Amino acid sequence: MQIRRAKPGDVDDVVSLVESAYRGESSRVGWTTEADLLDGQRTDPDEVVSVLDDLIVAEDDSGLVGCCTLIPRDGHAYFGMFAVRPGLQGGGVGSQLLAEAERLAAEHGAGHVEMTVISTRTELIDFYLRRGYVDTGETRPFPYGDDRFGRPRRDDLAFTVLVKQL
């Protein structure tokens, strides 16, 4: 597996990868599905293009197998758009990609990595806690009414903020 910065030619494949990992029936193959929480899209080409400079992809001979964004902020990096091809989840791709993102963040001077996870996704939060992230106790509101993030099937969604010191 090779991990690299995304290129403009990756946009459509990234959209397909993210959608397959989080939305619809195909996402149920993996454990990151949000199909019971949200309908609609998870991302679109415009969003991917807007973060292209901060997008990291993992690929093997079959194509893209994972992606994430690592967005520089004041003294830290924000980790997001994390997706692994559903059939490969649980096989180490995500752990390798996360470790590389953390390495890059430290290399570029970030003191910590921050991310947000839907609060009801306890298995996902546990994944990050096992990798050294800490629940800050802070929550952020879910963007209800903004279909770019999907159409909620519940009215109790919020984000938990996780941080890992580098």
Q: Predicted segments — roles?
A:
Residues 2-16:
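A short beta-loop-alpha structural element at the N-terminal edge
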Residues 19-47:
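Conserved GNAT-fold acetyl-CoA-binding loop/helix
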Residues 42-57, 78, 155-158:
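A short helix-loop-beta-strand connector motif used in the catalytic cores of GNAT acetyltransferases and
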Residues 57, 63-71, 76-83:
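Conserved beta-strand in the GNAT
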Residues 82-89, 117-119:
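A short, internal acetyl-CoA/4′-phosphopantetheine-binding micro-motif in the GNAT/acyltransferase core
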Residues 84, 90-103, 130:
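Conserved acetyl-CoA-binding loop-helix of GNAT-fold acetyltransferases
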Residues 111-125, 131-166:
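C-terminal "cap" of GNAT-fold acetyltransferases
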